[in-house]
Swiss-Prot record:
Stretches for region Disordered: 1-21
Enzyme class: transferase
Molecular function terms, GO-annotated: ATP binding; NEDD8 conjugating enzyme activity; NEDD8 ligase activity
Function description: Accepts the ubiquitin-like protein NEDD8 from the UBA3-NAE1 E1 complex and catalyzes its covalent attachment to other proteins. Together with the E3 ubiquitin ligase rnf7/rbx2, specifically neddylates cullin-5 (cul5). Does not neddylate cul1, cul2, cul3, cul4a or cul4b.
Stored CDD domains: UBCc_UBE2F_UBE2M
Family listed: Belongs to the ubiquitin-conjugating enzyme family. UBE2F subfamily.
Official protein name in the record: NEDD8-conjugating enzyme UBE2F
Organism: Xenopus laevis (African clawed frog)
UniProt KW keywords: ATP-binding, Nucleotide-binding, Transferase, Ubl conjugation pathway
Pathway in which this enzyme or protein is active: Protein modification; protein neddylation
Pfam families: UQ_con
Region annotation Interaction with uba3: where it falls in the sequence: 1-29
EC numbers, comma separated: 2.3.2.34
Lineage: Eukaryota, Metazoa, Chordata, Craniata, Vertebrata
Domain of life: Eukaryota
Length: 185
């Protein structure tokens, strides 16, 4: 799966047979992002929450993948929620772009897939936003936690969902279950 890692190893293995300028050209072609992703994807796959699964539509493009979260507790238990994760060229100075592809009734995810998760913010006044020390593992664990301990009704992106929960928790649960049946199986 890590074909980029294989390419990096091949490139490193033939260094001695190339001229210095050719080696430098080869090193420049492999972006900092891609070098980081080889390591981070391996770490991610080794430390994936049991409720998550990653899928790389093109194994040569580690900067684009899908994440499926299947919560085993909370309102969202029994659902399968798909996320699209795209890692920009400026990674790790900027966070990955994440979108929820599954329609969901959630206070921190809009029905159109926008996500409110502090570590995905490029600039954050409270210090919980993106930092170059964060990794894809942090992103995946954060998305997974949106269905459990990071489920936040007090600072919602989807205000209507948060107000619905405040007004009638049973009806909120029913709507979540309806969305799971219709969109998240």
């Amino acid at each position: 799966m890590l074909t980029l890692a294989s390419k990096l190893k091949r490139d490193d293995g033939v260094k001695g047979s190339r001229t210095t300028s050719t080696t430098l050209d080869s090193m420049r072609r492999i972006s900092v992002r891609d070098r980081l992703l080889v390591k981070e994807v391996a770490e991610l796959e080794a430390n994936l929450p049991c409720t998550c699964k990653v899928n790389f539509p093109d194994p040569n493009k580690l900067h684009y993948f899908h994440l499926t979260v299947s919560p085993d507790e909370s309102y969202y238990q029994g659902g399968r929620f798909q996320f699209e994760i795209e890692v920009p060229d400026a990674y790790n100075m900027v966070p990955p772009k994440v979108k929820c592809l599954t329609r969901i009734w959630h206070p921190n995810i809009t029905e159109t897939g926008e996500i409110c998760l502090s570590l995905l913010r490029e600039h954050s006044i409270d210090g919980t936003g993106w930092a170059p020390t964060r990794t894809l593992k942090d992103v995946v664990w954060g998305l997974n936690s949106l269905f459990t301990d990071l489920l936040n009704f007090d600072d919602p992106l989807n205000i209507e969902a948060a107000e619905h929960h405040l007004r009638d928790k049973d009806e909120y649960r029913n709507k979540v279950e309806d969305y799971i049946k219709r969109y998240a199986r």
